[in-house]
């Protein structure tokens, strides 16, 4: 019962804060705030450079595999548990899912820099 009350309070508070942020936007919108600042001078060129979508996809793939390493690092300490089969199966499933994702990216040519 205590956990249910805590969850209900958290959901209510989150919904209330999101509603307030949505329904009470900032009324004073200044166009100067959207411009880049260069020591008080007008910028020489556009500050918003085009972003390579290929770089973004490779960066996201790198972050996924970096997360995999972070999730697999505790495995040597988990070997001390009594049920090692569950730990091994979980690690194998995690590596398999990420390997399938990498194979999919490779076949869809998502890791190619040139087109």
From Swiss-Prot:
Pfam families hit by this protein: Oxidored_q4
Sorted UniProt keywords: Electron transport, Membrane, Mitochondrion, Mitochondrion inner membrane, NAD, Respiratory chain, Translocase, Transmembrane, Transmembrane helix, Transport, Ubiquinone
UniProt xrefs under InterPro entries: NADH_UbQ/plastoQ_OxRdtase_su3 (IPR000440), NDAH_ubi_oxred_su3_sf (IPR038430)
Residues annotated as transmembrane: 4-24, 55-75, 84-104
One CC-aspect GO term: mitochondrial inner membrane
Statement: the UniProt record of this protein carries the keyword Mitochondrion: yes
Cell location: Mitochondrion inner membrane
Record membrane topology: Multi-pass membrane protein
Catalysed reactions, as listed in the record: a ubiquinone + NADH + 5 H(+)(in) = a ubiquinol + NAD(+) + 4 H(+)(out)
BP terms from Gene Ontology: mitochondrial electron transport, NADH to ubiquinone
GO molecular-function terms, A-Z: NADH dehydrogenase (ubiquinone) activity
EC number: 7.1.1.2
Subunit text: Core subunit of respiratory chain NADH dehydrogenase (Complex I) which is composed of 45 different subunits. Interacts with TMEM186. Interacts with TMEM242.
Family: Belongs to the complex I subunit 3 family.
Free-text function comment from the UniProt entry: Core subunit of the mitochondrial membrane respiratory chain NADH dehydrogenase (Complex I) which catalyzes electron transfer from NADH through the respiratory chain, using ubiquinone as an electron acceptor. Essential for the catalytic activity of complex I.
Protein name per its UniProtKB record: NADH-ubiquinone oxidoreductase chain 3
